[in-house]
Amino acid sequence: MSNEENKVNEEAVVEEQVEAVGTEADVEWNESAEDSQEAKIAELEAALLASQAQVKEQQDTVLRAKAEEQNVRRRAEEDVDKARKYALKKFAGELLPVLDNLERALESGDKENEAAKALLEGVELTLQTFVSTVEKFGLTVINPMGEAFNPELHQAIGMQASPDHESNTVMIVMQKGYTLNDQVLRPAMVMVAQ
């Protein structure tokens, strides 16, 4: 073999070695690139999971805020209803003596006297108008004559034996009671049969 042939053979061997080294380098590079991609995928998956958890947390926070808003709105509406419903309580309580006095005037007036008769009719009309006006605002009269005694609506002044009335029934109403929107403003003062 000549030098030239040796050289050609050596060059071919060197080329094969270079190609082999290049292929090994490609394999190593591909493996490291694959490892890098897997690490990147794992990192992205972790970021995705964290983002999903954060979104779920934000959705939960929004739902809680909406529920709290609804609760606040409902409580405010209830408070307004209560205020509207019972705003007249003190005012109505102050009107009760006026009603009592008009009723006393009718009871004590001389119905036989012609001059007083016209006055009593005027007082009676005034009382009726007054009662119908306050009833529009939820004030109702408790007049339990002949009814069974109810401690929630009646205040017993005393008990008295009576053959004309059943036991535990109201036989005399000393002072009428009043409720405002189903809440007792003043119980009726009564005498109860034994």
Swiss-Prot record:
Keyword Chaperone: yes
Pfam families linked: GrpE
UniProt-annotated location(s): Cytoplasm
Single GO molecular function: protein-folding chaperone binding
Keyword field: Chaperone, Cytoplasm, Stress response
SUPFAM superfamilies named among the record's database cross-references: Coiled-coil domain of nucleotide exchange factor GrpE, Head domain of nucleotide exchange factor GrpE
Quaternary context: Homodimer.
PROSITE patterns assigned: GRPE
An individual GO BP term: protein folding
Name of the coding gene: grpE
Gene Ontology cellular component annotations, sorted alphabetically: cytosol
InterPro entries: GrpE (IPR000740), GrpE_coiled_coil (IPR013805), GrpE_head (IPR009012)
Protein task: Participates actively in the response to hyperosmotic and heat shock by preventing the aggregation of stress-denatured proteins, in association with DnaK and GrpE. It is the nucleotide exchange factor for DnaK and may function as a thermosensor. Unfolded proteins bind initially to DnaJ; upon interaction with the DnaJ-bound protein, DnaK hydrolyzes its bound ATP, resulting in the formation of a stable complex. GrpE releases ADP from DnaK; ATP binding to DnaK triggers the release of the substrate protein, thus completing the reaction cycle.
Protein name: Protein GrpE
Source organism superkingdom: Bacteria
Principal location: cytoplasm
